Amino acid sequence: MKSPLELERYFVSDQAVTARHVFSPEKDIETRVEEYSVSNEAIRLPAVEDQSEKWQVTVHIKHQPATETNFPYDFRLTIVGIFRCAIEKAEPSHIERLMKINGSSILYGMSREIIRANTERGPWSGIVIPTYSFYEPKPNNESPPEESTAV
């Protein structure tokens, strides 16, 4: 089965990793959910003749620990992917949802490895950021298709 979502290319548009001088390797590492943020967006690109629909998906990741939090690094990363949608005759809202959930998930997985690789080169051990779900339930105004009954 061919995937309805194809990643054409991706790039990191913003990235910074800072080793924190206040980190104490003798103490346990602290992680606070409120110090970690993830956001995403999906934008349909202008159509080009004889090509399937393209979308730009962007994922922003940021970890900014408070001074008293014992964590080895603060970091931020923005990754952008250009995706092609192979689904024909689909509702635009369904394609946008596919891009926001699946496209963002693909980019987030890549981001986890980029952040791990960059922190591995720092003075403290490398970190692997937590997994993240971009799933959002369908809005209430989108009802599932009705089942047809044969007569």
What residue spans do the PLM features occupy?
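N-terminal intrinsically disordered, cationic/polar leader segments
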Residues: 1-106, 113-151
